[in-house]
């Protein structure tokens, strides 16, 4: 199997294609991407027969910025007979994947696919039963086995394949289902909540998003991101010339500092989190984030980089490379991840975690 399907935000197919082509080449997997504008997915086709399998096995899904999901597929199944769509799909998957732990019948995230989504939901139950009977799926769901994907691009037309549960998105269609909290000051709060789900393993939340931590929110007004920190019982310094929502101030956990986020300097050295969602050129934001990390002003940060109209992948790559270079220069080991989240628009969200410092005299930041 030499093809890989990648879901993405509609309108960002070119960025997703540029990224997979670049990162596949680094693994010495060469091929080309098939792109249909505003389709919400990209198909990368390698020149060698096992290229798709190699990518989903060896390319860390966490390293991809513009992809919501990644799985290997075979040839497109066309014109499935309405009276029996199941048999061809089962036949396509037999011998390809054995004892998958989960089935996802999916569509791309577009308005055109909403009607098809209703069919997918109804179709999942009988297809799952048939795949279990054929030995393609285990008799019970398990996260320890591959995920079987059936991806419909049109009625009666689908790709079939699989992903590895330790190298994919755990979410259906690659989208976490989050509910907007009615007491949040703005919908931007969902960006930070989604970032926590994507970047921080669930079993580490109690340690890394703990009660009583100190946090800073740069460009905080009206408080969508501060809300998420307060919700986790952190003490938050919210930095912005604009006012904060009174509901947040009433908690007693928020200190509002009327300052420019680019000029603010923290006066304490035990800040666990700094978050930032400012509308500014990405290079300027990247430089500020690097400054915070190099100076040890925070242990972890989540921030947004607003994207230009053109060469978005190149711009983000340059910004991330700049931050990495600054950390390397100062002997700081850190983990960097970036993703265009479901709740992001013309932007990507970046997470950086300082692990330890290799410079004498600088304390361990873990």
From Swiss-Prot:
Q: Where is the active site?
A: 306
Q: Identify the enzyme class.
A: transferase
- Got a GO cellular component term for this one? cytoplasm
- GO BP term, pick one: rRNA processing
Q: Which keywords, in A-to-Z order, does the entry hold? A: Cytoplasm, Methyltransferase, rRNA processing, S-adenosyl-L-methionine, Transferase
Where does the record place it? Answer: Cytoplasm
Q: Which residues bind S-adenosyl-L-methionine?
A: 188, 221-224, 240, 260, 277
User: What is this enzyme's EC?
Assistant: 2.1.1.186
Query: Which chemical reaction does it catalyze?
Result: cytidine(2498) in 23S rRNA + S-adenosyl-L-methionine = 2'-O-methylcytidine(2498) in 23S rRNA + S-adenosyl-L-homocysteine + H(+)
A Gene Ontology molecular function term of the record: S-adenosylmethionine-dependent methyltransferase activity
Role: Catalyzes the 2'-O-methylation at nucleotide C2498 in 23S rRNA.
Family, according to the entry, reads as follows: Belongs to the class I-like SAM-binding methyltransferase superfamily. RNA methyltransferase RlmE family. RlmM subfamily.
Describe its assembly.
Answer: Monomer.
| Protein name as catalogued | Ribosomal RNA large subunit methyltransferase M
Q: From which source organism is this entry?
A: Klebsiella pneumoniae (strain 342)
């Amino acid at each position: 199997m030499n093809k890989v399907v990648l879901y993405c935000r509609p309108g960002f197919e070119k960025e997703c294609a540029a990224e997979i082509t670049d990162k596949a080449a680094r693994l010495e997997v060469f091929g080309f991407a098939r792109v249909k504008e505003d389709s919400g997915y990209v198909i990368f086709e390698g020149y060698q027969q096992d290229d798709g399998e190699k990518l989903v096995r060896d390319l860390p899904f966490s390293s991809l910025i513009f992809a919501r999901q990644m799985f290997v597929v075979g040839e497109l199944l066309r014109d499935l007979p309405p009276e029996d769509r199941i048999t061809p799909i089962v036949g396509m998957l037999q011998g390809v994947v054995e004892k998958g732990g989960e089935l996802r019948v999916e569509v791309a995230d577009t308005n055109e696919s909403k009607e098809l989504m209703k069919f997918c939901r109804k179709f999942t139950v009988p297809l799952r039963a048939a795949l279990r009977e054929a030995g393609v799926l285990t008799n019970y769901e398990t996260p320890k086995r591959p995920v079987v994907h059936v991806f419909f691009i049109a009625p009666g037309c689908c790709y079939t394949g699989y992903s590895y549960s330790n190298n994919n998105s755990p979410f259906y269609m690659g989208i976490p289902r989050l509910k907007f909290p009615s007491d949040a000051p703005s919908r931007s709060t969902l960006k930070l909540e989604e970032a926590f789900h994507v970047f921080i393993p669930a079993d580490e939340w109690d340690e890394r998003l703990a009660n009583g931590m100190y946090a800073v929110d740069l460009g905080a007004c009206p408080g969508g991101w501060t809300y998420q920190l307060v919700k986790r019982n952190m003490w938050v310094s919210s930095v912005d010339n604009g006012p904060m929502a009174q509901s947040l101030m009433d908690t007693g956990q928020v200190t509002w500092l009327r300052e420019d986020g680019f000029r603010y300097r923290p006066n304490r050295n035990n800040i666990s989190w700094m978050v930032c969602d400012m509308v500014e050129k990405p290079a300027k934001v990247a430089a500020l984030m690097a400054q915070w990390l190099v100076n040890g002003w925070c242990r972890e940060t989540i921030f947004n980089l607003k994207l230009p109209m053109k060469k978005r992948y190149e711009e983000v790559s340059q910004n991330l490379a700049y931050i990495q270079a600054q950390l390397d220069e100062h002997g700081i080991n850190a983990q960097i991840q970036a993703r265009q989240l479901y709740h992001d628009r013309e932007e990507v969200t970046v997470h950086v975690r300082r692990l330890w410092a290799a410079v004498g005299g600088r304390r361990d930041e873990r």
